[in-house]
């Protein structure tokens, strides 16, 4: 959930959560969050003005959240526990011979074992913009979503071919909306638990 170094979902969830708290004037929630994860040395003991200034540097204001790029890149998201589930499924249920085509032979008639890797994913992609909008809806932030096109988008498309995994009997179960809900609930729980011990 680091504002500079985390992956797409954690960064967007935290930014939108903080913007919602600011929008609603919930300074207690803002302070709980930044006490747990200070932002460049700024924590809950700083003044409102210092906190606002630091969060604005990361595109977080009471009125809007600004995210990098255009929001157009497409990404695939897999719930982490499902990565583990898919791995266990393959270990327990798949024989190595099922991972390659034995009918393919080289010029000497020898079976070549190639491309026997198994991609794990959902096989579904969603734009970063759509993900941000889903997060805003989940969190309940009523402010504006802005995009800073002067910042890089990164690779425009990242999608795995999961047809081999599907043919071996495993499919994901957690869709993006449910994953966002679960991750946000986990994030809030972490703030509450850690705030009680601080």
Task: Tell where the protein language model's regions lie, with residue ranges.
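C-terminal substrate-binding subdomain of Rossmann-fold SDR/epimerase-dehydratase oxidoreductases
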Residues: 12, 16-198
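Active-site loop immediately N-terminal to the catalytic Tyr-X3-Lys motif
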Residues: 1
């Amino acid at each position: 959930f680091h504002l500079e170094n985390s992956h797409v979902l954690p960064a967007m969830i935290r930014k939108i959560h903080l913007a919602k708290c600011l929008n609603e004037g919930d300074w207690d929630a803002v302070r709980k969050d930044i006490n747990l994860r200070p932002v460049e040395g700024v924590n809950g003991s700083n003044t409102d003005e210092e906190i606002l200034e630091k969060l604005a540097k990361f595109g977080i204001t009471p009125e809007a959240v600004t995210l990098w790029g255009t929001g157009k890149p497409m990404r695939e998201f897999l719930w982490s526990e499902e990565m583990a589930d898919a791995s266990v499924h393959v270990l327990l249920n798949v024989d190595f011979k099922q991972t390659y085509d034995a009918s393919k032979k080289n010029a000497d008639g020898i079976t070549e074992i190639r491309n026997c890797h198994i991609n794990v994913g959902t096989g579904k992609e969603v734009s970063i913009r759509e993900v941000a909008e889903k997060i805003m809806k989940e969190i309940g932030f009523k402010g504006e979503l802005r995009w800073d096109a002067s910042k890089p988008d990164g690779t425009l498309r990242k999608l795995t071919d999961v047809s081999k995994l599907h043919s071996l009997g495993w499919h994901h179960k957690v869709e993006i909306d449910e994953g966002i809900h679960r991750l946000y609930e986990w994030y809030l729980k972490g703030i509450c638990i850690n705030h009680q011990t601080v």
